[in-house]
Amino acid sequence: MSNVIVFGGHGKVALLTTRILSERGHTVTSVIRDADQSDEIRAHGGEPRVADIQQQSLTDFAELVRGHDAVVWSAGAGGGSVDRTWAIDRDAAILSVQGAKQAGVDRYVMVSWSGSQLDHGVPQDDDFFAYAQSKAIADAVVRDSGLQWTIVAPSTLTDDDATGSVDWDGSSTEVPRGDVAHVIADVLETPGTAGNTIRFNSGSTPVADFLRADAV
């Protein structure tokens, strides 16, 4: 079993991922900003680590991830200010990648979104631009990192019940957060997904089968 560190540990997807991983026997360290969230992290099977990712240097990130087998980046500004979006979704994300490399943690999973690409087409005067551009830049850094990376790129998230099945066939534009968590957990247990961007939404293909096909 592996020792995984999850950034953005109090987010909905991260909490669900922590529960799945802990139930499968993995050890999960959840990085959170607020110590008051610690009890909820423990209730989901994780061990809280309090750190403000906006204030961490490269050295700080390297020390946070050192000793773990894998990094999951599930942090985000969550619709905050533009400055905070750049600071978390781009700058802190990039530092986490560089920190993993510096610390010798080879496995890295970035939680992104299905539209993330440098030619995303979002106008600069659109409120969504900072997020779209931040994710595209961070994902590009992940791909060029030399790490054993996987980018998990779901479509629009919902709080519907998880189904355990996904697809990428245009039949849906949404996916439950629980299924995203399932994909993240299975990606960590499927080495063949390294070097791939996994785009998906709700569907009828069991997650394990979907990932095996994507990893071919």
PLM features per residue range, with description:
Residues 93, 134, 152, 170-186, ...:
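Substrate-positioning beta->alpha
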Residues 120, 159-164, 187-196:
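Glycine/proline-rich active-site loop of Rossmann-fold NAD(P)-dependent oxidoreductases
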